[in-house]
Each structure stands twice: as structure tokens, then as C-alpha cells.
Amino acid sequence: MNLPIVNERNRPDVPRKGVQKIRTVIEGFDEITHGGLPIGRTTLVSGTSGTGKTLLAVQFLYQGIHHFDYPGLFITFEESPSDIIENAYSFGWDLQQLIDDGKLFILDASPDPEGQEVVGTFDLSALIERIQYAVRKYKAKLVSIDSVTAVFQQYDAASVVRREIFRLVARLKQLQVTSIMTTERVEEYGPIARFGVEEFVSDNVVVLRNVLEGERRRRTVEILKLRGTTHMKGEYPFTITHDGINIFPLGAMRLTQRSSNARISSGVQTLDEMCGGGFFKDSIILATGATGTGKTLLVSKFLQEGCRQRERAILFAYEESRAQLSRNASSWGIDFEEMEHKGLLKLLCTYPESAGLEDHLQMIKSEISEFKPSRIAIDSLSALARGVTNNAFRQFVIGVTGYAKQEEITGFFTNTTDQFMGAHSITESHISTITDTILMLQYVEIRGEMSRALNVFKMRGSWHDKGIREYSISHDGPDIRDSFRNYERIISGSPTRISVDEKSELSRIVRGVKDKTAE
């Protein structure tokens, strides 16, 4: 049960092994820290109110006790032990049982509610001795301190704060414990800590943020430094679930998933022919177009075909209710309720604004892990993009597509464009590069009548039809016809009819080229 002792590296007769780490078993945290926290060192966790500092400190101890049987010590300067124990219950962590078993000890250093007056020179000697006594008595390997700001907020001299924090960190290192020390900051992107000195006396610094982006809050974590070892750079989104902190280390994702040559049907025979025999299994398809062009219809046919093949499927809907989806599908001869009754289909409908993108991503991953579908659909991505930054939205899409490919799932997503007719950007967030197949749907005005057009704009690794097909929607679903004949500039929104003379001239030129080639 003894951890590797880092201070042995300082002995001349012991070969250097580098900084060794202990896994935190916090979802995603070990990935961005390249293996966990350095053993025998103190990590400063800084953040504004509500970022999850206390939760991280408690979860660090709980996971260490639960997975590795390392005794832990929690030192609280703010909340009472009873509040900490009660709050932990909401995550399924029975701290009282760990205390009764002698695996966890909570040292109550919270302030006297009646107030206290400081007289003379301030130092932490008595507190440091209490911590040392508790560490040795309970043989603690892990220590969490929450938070040092509460101790020093009534003292103005930065030199005193620096001196006492340095003494505390030095004693923890001498005791050979791996510790987390939380501190508050005033701004999300300002000074790292309240007093401006905490980060300089700590070996490692982790910054938690809770930033208002657009109309939603977004939590991120950044590893500012891990002294003597490597870590991932930048901010990574995280959410707080019933299991605690869950980080999405998108930068740690590797493009190592297998690619299948097997084809699956879209549920529309003509569309399969346009795609060279159907979609690739485990590929990501994006149908983009104005409202009413038939995107949800293509999604419904895609899901229906999967259920017909006895495959499981999930539809994540962010614009329509379950009743509305079922009603619309029935008008095309698709019975969603029967598929659900057979256990082949799952409809999940929610408003995009009901949660942050990280929460939606976590929910999608959890549902996929539980239901184990072969096909998933999201209708629509553009609904989720409302009120968030392009970068946050792109990270969300990368998280979904990366997880789907990892699980070898075929994904069909829709995107609603803001222009009703004419040329338009496929997506505003450049997510088109992440998808494997793009179906472009749009309206076309021909001789005063409105028609629909469909084009396989892109399909990685496969031949596909380059033509712009006309299609209509009937009670059987989409009816894809031949390409628009005698018309050009359809995608631009200004279709122009090619005259007979122009056609004859083009034919003559083509025949001339063929004759010269034959000679």
C-alpha cells in the first residue's frame, strides 16, 4: 500500500526515476494530466465560486480510498464536517462510513461563528502540528485542504501569506503525502489566486472556470503547471454529474478507430445508389438545408431501416416533442411507437437550453453506453448551437463524433441553414470537415413553382453521384428523381435554363473532341 517516495530521488545513491504520479480516477482528469497528480507534492486548485473546487478535493480523496485503499485526510476551513458529509451523499459517496472504517478523517478548522480577533504575529504553527499529528495517526496518504483563502483573507501582508503557505506546503512534502489545496480567485481570467502568491509556492496548479459564454455557463479546467512532468495544454470542458466531475479531454482523443468497408442502407434506395451502395458503417452523415427540405424525413428513414435490420437506434431530438415526431413519422408510413415497443428505438427529446453542451454530451454518451445502439441521429445540431460560441459548439460535435466512431456507430445529424434559398455556408462552425458524408438539401424555383433539390455534396472514400436531383415528399417518404435537366446554377439559387442552341453547340464540341481523340 506504500506509495513510491519521491524524495528518494535526492539521494545520490538512488538512480533518478522522474516524477511518479497517482491516478485520481476522476473521469478525464488523468488524461489531461498524463497519468494523474505527482506523488508527494501539493496541487493548488484555483477557481471562482461555484467552479467545483470543493467537489474536486472531496472526489480526489474518495476515489483514492475507494480504488486504492489510501487513507485520506480532509481539512476544512469553510464548511462544517456535517455539511461536507451531507453534500457528498448526493453523489453516492458515504463519507461517514469511511470515517467509521478509519479510512477518512475530517479535521475541522472552520472559523468560529462568533468571530475571532487576531492579536500579535500570525502563523500556522499550531495548525501545521495538528495536520502532522492527524497524518501520522491515520497514516494518511492523501490530503485535501479547503480552502487556504478562508485562513488568510483577514491578513493583508502578502509576505505573511507566502511564508505560511510555503511552510504548510513544505511540511506536507516532508510528510510524503499527495495533497490538493483549494484557493479562491476573483475573476475567471485574472490573477490565479486571491493573494497572488499561492501559485508560486505550489508545485502544481489547476485552474477551474465557470464562464458565461453567450447565454449559457460553461465549466472548464486548465492544467497551468505540473512541475517536472508533462501535461496537456489549454482549457477542457467538464460537467458535474451524479458521479461527480466529468472532464471531456477532447485533445486526448486519438484518430485510431477502425474504419469499416461495410455499407449500410439509408432507408432510401435511390439515395443508396447515389452514395455508391449506401453509407459506410461507423461514418458520420450530415444533412444540411433550410427548414422543411426533408432532413427529419431522411433521419426517420435511416432509423426505420436500422430497426428493420434488428439494429438498435437512438434519436436525440432538440426541436420537436415525442408526440410530434411520432405523428410526422406516421404520415410517411413509419411507426416509431412500434419500434420503441420492440425495444429497438429510443426517442429522447429535450430543449437545447435545458442544459449546457457538456451536459448534453454527457447525456448522449451515457445513453449510448446503456442502450448500445448501432445507429444514432441528432435532430438538429443547429438547435444546440444557439447561444454558444463556435469553439464550444465545435468541441461538442468533436466529442459526439469521436465517441460514435470509437463505438463503431453510424451517426446521422441534421443542420438547419438560415437561408431559405440560394447558396449558403454548409455550417457556420466549420463542422463540415468533421463529417464523412454531406447531403445538401435546398429549395429551387423553376418556372414559378417551388421544387426541392438534393445533392451528395461530399462522401469520403467512395464514388458518389455528383448530380443535383429533384425530389418530392409523399406518404411513402422521399421520391428522388433524375437530375434537373436543361438547368444550371441551381445551387446558387438562380437556375438558368440552357437553350437548345447552347445544347447543340456543347454536343458539337464534345463530338469534335472525341473525333480528335480517336485519330
Swiss-Prot record:
Q: Which family does it belong to?
A: Belongs to the KaiC family.
Q: Where does Mg(2+) 1 bind?
A: T54
Its domain of life reads Bacteria
Look up and give the organism this protein is from. Synechocystis sp. (strain ATCC 27184 / PCC 6803 / Kazusa)
Q: Which InterPro entries match?
A: Circadian_clock_KaiC-rel, Circadian_KaiC_bact, KaiC, KaiC-like_dom, KaiC_C, KaiC_dom, KaiC_N, P-loop_NTPase
The primary gene name is kaiC1
Annotated protein name in UniProt:
Circadian clock oscillator protein KaiC 1
Q: Where is the KaiC domain?
A: 1-248, 262-519
The record's listing under PROSITE patterns reads: KAIC
Q: Which GO terms describe its biological process?
A: circadian rhythm; protein autophosphorylation; regulation of circadian rhythm; regulation of DNA-templated transcription
Q: Which reaction does it catalyse?
A: L-seryl-[protein] + ATP = O-phospho-L-seryl-[protein] + ADP + H(+); L-threonyl-[protein] + ATP = O-phospho-L-threonyl-[protein] + ADP + H(+); ATP + H2O = ADP + phosphate + H(+)
The entry's free-text remark on the cofactor is: Binds 2 Mg(2+) ions per subunit, one in each domain. Mg(2+) is required for hexamerization and phosphatase activity.
- List residues modified as Phosphoserine: S432
